Amino acid sequence: MAKLYFYYSAMNAGKTTTLLQSAHNYRERGMRTSILTPKLDHRAGSGVVASRIGLRADGQTFDRQTELLQLIERDIAAHGPLHCVLVDEAQFLSSAQVWQLSEVVDRLRIPVLCYGLRTDFRGELFEGSQFLLAWADELEEIKTICHSGSKATMTVRVDAQGHAVQDGPQVEIGGNERYVSVSRAEFKKIMRGEGRIDPLQIALPLPPA
């Protein structure tokens, strides 16, 4: 039975790596997948989904006006049966788009796997995450670690000096240089202005090609 899944975490927990591995698992078994990625996230190039450890795949882009059920129906009409839809950066979905993805599951009987942040740099839910938490059939946390050694559940936006940024737009695309995953206790401390956090994380070594 097809389901709507939401895999959520703080920054740098390996969400995109997990998405790409899931897509690979389907394709390895001869099943066709569609990866959806927001237009506003073009760090790796438009329509390219890339993880921090070097995995990459092409995806279809969407913005807040894209009707996702129609997008998937057109994909099937053009390319044949589809076995799974995977959504990167799902926090950027609108509530209407989350509902459309639930229709992909319920009407087309295609599983939809969404990967995204739960909360923004203020500790507040993104719209997409809010409605995925409400409507998804299955919820799973992808865990990562705070510099304190505790589980990281929050994401803080920092400036060049490592101090918390408390104002600004909710959506600001950036990677390790802008955001740090922390525990709730550390989030409270840095938001109070107690200390700083080095925004740069050690690059992961890649195996030789």
Curated annotation (Swiss-Prot):
The active site is at residue 89. It holds the Pfam family TK. It is found in: Cytoplasm. Disulfide bonds: none annotated. Gene3D superfamilies: P-loop containing nucleotide triphosphate hydrolases (3.40.50.300). Homotetramer. This is Thymidine kinase. It comes from Xanthomonas campestris pv. campestris (strain ATCC 33913 / DSM 3586 / NCPPB 528 / LMG 568 / P 25). The gene is tdk.
